[in-house]
Design a protein with these regions (language model features):
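Extended C-terminal regions of large enzymes
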Residues: 1-220
Length: 220
């Protein structure tokens, strides 16, 4: 499509107004909603990812204090989530959360569940500090099918499905080096209209080394 209009890919990639991501597809809930997690997530499929298990948490309306408490309970550390526009450098917990997002996205696609409402890491129960039930999908699945599964079991199933499409993509792409030939981010994520530095409050600008580190951690 880009060749047809005579516009170089770099021109699309460097201009945020195009909403272009990579491999011919647009962005979908990237750094403007979840920092590094949103950026790596958008590279994991061959189109804009219909994934909302991250943004339904960061855009839930909960104060950051409550979100960080839920993050500590669910993923092991408060740093797994940041306030939008007040991002901190990447770490293992952010990428651990990304793995759950990918697993649940595939799971919801297979089970026909709405990926905006689920998963249920949080809930309206103030007495429980808004901590939800990450095993809710497993409870529904077990009740309907009679096959007992835990949330971890279903996450493994989701990752298996995701890895299958990644392997298929490698075959169709003719390359096993997905980091070089597929998992590409656009140049505009490294810019800011006011030239604010990454990790400055008020900007969603990313840092190239930090994004590369995010990929490294995720694929470990």
């Amino acid at each position: 499509m880009l060749d047809h209009f005579g516009i170089p890919v770099k021109t699309w990639s460097d201009d945020h107004r195009t909403l272009y991501w990579s491999n011919g597809h647009p962005k979908h809930h990237t750094n403007e909603d979840d920092g590094q997690l949103g950026c790596v997530l958008n590279c994991m499929w061959n189109r804009d990812p219909m994934a909302h298990a991250h943004v339904n948490f960061t855009r839930s309306g909960l104060p950051i204090k409550e979100m960080k408490h839920i993050a500590k309970v669910t993923w092991g550390d408060e740093s797994a989530v940041d306030q939008i526009g007040d991002y901190t450098p990447t770490n293992t917990y952010k990428m651990k959360r990304l793995q759950r997002v990918i697993a649940r996205t595939e799971l919801h696609n297979m089970l026909g569940l709405c990926s905006w409402m689920a998963p249920w890491e949080y809930c309206p129960d103030e007495k429980n500090q808004y901590v939800g039930d990450p095993n809710m999908e497993a409870k529904i699945f077990s009740a309907v099918t009679g096959v007992n599964k835990t949330g971890d079991d279903l996450d493994k199933d989701g990752i298996r499905a995701w890895m299958l499409q990644r392997v298929y993509t490698m075959r169709q792409l003719g390359s096993s080096n997905m980091r070089k030939d597929h998992d590409l981010v656009p140049g505009w994520i490294y810019t800011d209209p006011k030239d604010r530095k990454p990790f400055t409050k008020g900007t969603v600008r990313m840092d190239p080394d930090d994004i590369n580190k995010s990929f490294d951690i995720f694929f470990e």
